Amino acid sequence: MQSTALSALTVQVLWAGFLVSMVFGAITQRTRFCTMGAISDVVSYGDWTRMRQWGMAVGVAMIGFSILAYGGWINPAKSIYASTRWLWLSALVGGFLFGLGMVLGSGCGSKTLVRIGSGNLKAFVVFLVMGVAAFATLKGITAVVRVATVERVGIELSQGTTLTDWAASASGVPATVAGMALSMVIGGGLIFWASRERSFRHPENYLAGLGIGGAVI
C-alpha cells in the first residue's frame, strides 16, 4: 500500500473512531450505562436493570463480532487475546487491580472519559494517572515486574485459549462457524435474559444495550 493511501486510510479510521466514541459517550451519559454502577446496583439495592443493559450490550457485541469474523472482514486469530498460552494468574491479578481502581476512581475508563466531558476535574486526574500507569504496565518499569512475576505462570494449550478455539477443536468445524454458533447461543441468551424482564422494557435500556453493543462492533 502506498504511503498516500495509507495516510488517507489512517485519517478515515481516526475520524470513524472519533464518531463512534462520541456516540458511545452520548449513550453512556444518557442511559447511565456503567459497569461499576451495574454491580453496585445489584449488591446494594438488588436492582438488575443496569446489569441487564450490560448483558444485552455484550450479547449484541458478541453476535456482531462473530458475523464480521464469519464474513471475513476481521481475523480474530490476529487479536492479542487469541494466544495458545492461558495467563490465568495475570488475569486474576489484573482483574482484581482493575476492580479496585474502578471503585477508587468512581468508574472504569469509559465512565472516566464521560465524566471528563461533563466537566469533572477528579475524572481528569484519574484519567492522567490511569494513562501513565497503563503505559508503564505495557512498556515501563511495572512491565518488568509483570513479565517477571504473573506472566511466568500460565498453561500452554494446543487449541488456543478462546471458547471458539475449544469448540472448533472439539467439533472439527471451522473456527468461524464455531464462533458464530457460540455467539448465537451465549449472546442470544444474554439478550433474551435482559429483555425478558418487563421492568427492563424501556427505550433507554434498549438504547444502552443495543447502542453500546453496536458501538463496540
Predicted feature descriptions by range:
Residues 1-217:
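Membrane-interfacial helix-loop segments of redox and metal-homeostasis proteins
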